[in-house]
Amino acid sequence: MKNKRVIKKNFEFQEIINYKKTIKNFCFVIYYKDNEESYLKYGISVGKKIGNAVIRNKVKRQIRMILKQNISEIGTVSKDIIILVRKSVLELKYATLSKLLIKLIKEIK
């Protein structure tokens, strides 16, 4: 089953980043743009400066799970978002990451 909420193509990432609307905290930078759909679409980018491949994939899995578990809270946001992860994410626990990310996404509304 294809997940229609995920942004994967490079040109889609570039389009949203070039739109230049951002919101950030010490863990995440979120680029966002309005979309025509009635749901949130997201892409996750973790740079190579953050750990090795195992660590980067773990962070991406955690972010996907946070979004999946909290979709009822953030589902009304009809935006395309790109989540850029900063290195400070490695020092935080999952519960803290969840609170920070959900709070940031809610601010987009």
Curated annotation (Swiss-Prot):
Membrane-traversing stretches: none
InterPro entries: Ribosomal_Su5_D2-typ_SF (IPR020568), Ribsml_uS5_D2-typ_fold_subgr (IPR014721), RNase_P (IPR000100), RNase_P_CS (IPR020539)
Domain of life: Bacteria
Enzyme Commission designation: 3.1.26.5
Keywords per UniProt: Endonuclease, Hydrolase, Nuclease, RNA-binding, tRNA processing
GO molecular function annotation: 3'-tRNA processing endoribonuclease activity; ribonuclease P activity; tRNA binding
Recorded GO CC terms: ribonuclease P complex
Pfam family, one: Ribonuclease_P
Catalytic activity: Endonucleolytic cleavage of RNA, removing 5'-extranucleotides from tRNA precursor
Enzyme class at the top of the EC tree: hydrolase
One Gene Ontology term from the biological process aspect of the record: tRNA 5'-leader removal
Function: RNaseP catalyzes the removal of the 5'-leader sequence from pre-tRNA to produce the mature 5'-terminus. It can also cleave other RNA substrates such as 4.5S RNA. The protein component plays an auxiliary but essential role in vivo by binding to the 5'-leader sequence and broadening the substrate specificity of the ribozyme.
PANTHER family the record matches: RIBONUCLEASE P PROTEIN COMPONENT
Similarity comment text for this entry: Belongs to the RnpA family.
Assembly and oligomerization: Consists of a catalytic RNA component (M1 or rnpB) and a protein subunit.
Name of this chain's protein: Ribonuclease P protein component
Organism: Mycoplasma capricolum subsp. capricolum (strain California kid / ATCC 27343 / NCTC 10154)
